[in-house]
């Protein structure tokens, strides 16, 4: 309704498509929109020529201000590299199971911070050295991201754009098509194609595929970082503000 009202009042409209394929709301709003902001190069070609701009997603400023020292209160007592597992706000049963089944082997080489989702704590692991688990965190996330050497995550658009902006080597495990419209799969494949991420399909997640992915990303982390550094999608807020100012000035 806001978009249609704005258009009827001759007010320019900018919409943002986070996922690689347009959702229903943006499809309906497209005829009324002056510009469409996109996260993925592939998305731009799905809109009329000249309508879409690859801007990326505005990133919360606090994520850039994380301090690894502040996250040391996780209780780690050695200098092992850190893996941060992020299963989304509600967690991921599939990822939680894979991590916990392999936790002893993981802890031989890494310290592990596991964000497992509400109600998903496993108290049998509470005293395991090098492993900390939380249902969910908010203000501490920036510091934990600063501490992490490698991130294992779902492939929601905002989450992966944050990993790109922070230059964090990552393994993406997108929601399966059976549990979603497939947008995370396409998001992940775009990042894989660009060289930003290693992708494991949810249905292919196993001990073997998990450790193969960890070995690849950790052993080649500098290559992943350098590839992400070539992306210009780190200052999306300024790009979008510039677009707004242009439309207002040319109204």
Model-derived features: positions:
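Short alpha-helical segment that forms part of, or immediately flanks, the ligand-binding pocket
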Residues: 4, 142, 160-168, 189
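Structural loop-to-beta junction motif characteristic of Rossmann-like glycosyltransferase folds
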Residues: 11-12, 149-150, 167-175, 196
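C-terminal alpha-helical cap of glycosyltransferases
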Residues: 233-251
